[in-house]
C-alpha cells in the first residue's frame, strides 16, 4: 500500500489537489468506449498512445488488476477559446507525468500515469511508435484504454456530464496506478 500522506504531498506540489484514492478494480472497462474511439475520435489510428496502437480490452482490464491502488484526479476548467483546451490539458498531463516520476523515485516502480485526454505532449502526434518524438512521455487516455470515465467517476461521487457547448465548465479526469 502506498504512503498516502507522502504521495498526497507530491500530488499537491504538482498542482493536483482534487483527487480520490480508489481500488483499481472499480475502474469500468467497456467495449463501447473503444468503439466510440474508433467511430468518433479524430485521433484514432493517428496517435501512438491511442487505439489501435494500444492493447486489446482484455489486456487493458488485466492492467488494472495488477495494481493495488489507483488515484483519480479531477480537473475543472472553463476556457474562453475552445482551442485553449489543448494547452490546458497539456499542462495537466505534464503534471501527471511529474507525479508518476516522483512516485517512481519514491520506490513505486510500477507507477504509471493515465492522461486526461489523448497524449499531446509534443503537440502533433505520429501513428507509428518508432517515430514517436517522446516515447518515454507518451501515455494513453482513460478512454483509449476502454475506461468508462462517466461510470467510473460517478461511482466515486464526482460530477460529469455531456457538454453541449464549449463555454460550459469541463470536468477532466486522469489517473495514477500505483503499487
What are these regions (language model features)?
Residues 1-22:
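TRNA-binding/sensing appendages of the translation machinery
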Residues 18-47, 51-179:
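Catalytic cores of enzyme domains
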Amino acid at each position: 500500500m502506498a504512503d498516502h500522506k507522502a504521495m498526497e504531498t507530491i500530488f499537491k506540489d504538482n498542482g493536483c489537489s482534487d483527487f480520490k484514492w480508489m481500488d483499481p478494480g472499480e475502474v469500468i472497462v467497456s467495449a463501447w468506449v473503444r468503439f466510440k474511439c474508433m467511430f468518433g475520435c479524430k485521433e484514432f489510428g493517428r496517435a501512438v498512445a491511442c487505439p489501435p496502437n494500444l492493447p486489446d480490452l482484455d489486456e487493458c482490464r488485466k492492467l488494472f488488476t495488477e495494481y493495488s491502488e489507483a488515484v483519480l484526479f479531477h480537473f475543472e476548467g472553463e476556457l474562453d477559446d475552445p482551442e485553449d483546451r489543448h494547452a490546458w490539458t497539456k499542462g495537466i498531463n505534464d503534471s501527471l507525468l511529474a507525479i508518476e516520476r516522483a512516485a517512481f523515485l519514491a520506490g513505486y516502480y510500477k507507477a504509471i500515469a493515465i492522461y486526461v485526454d489523448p497524449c499531446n505532449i509534443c503537440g502533433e502526434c505520429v501513428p507509428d511508435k518508432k517515430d514517436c518524438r517522446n516515447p518515454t512521455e507518451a501515455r494513453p487516455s482513460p478512454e483509449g484504454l476502454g475506461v468508462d470515465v462517466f461510470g467510473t467517476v460517478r461511482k466515486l461521487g464526482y460530477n460529469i456530464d455531456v457538454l453541449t457547448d464549449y463555454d460550459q465548465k469541463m470536468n477532466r479526469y486522469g489517473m495514477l496506478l500505483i503499487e
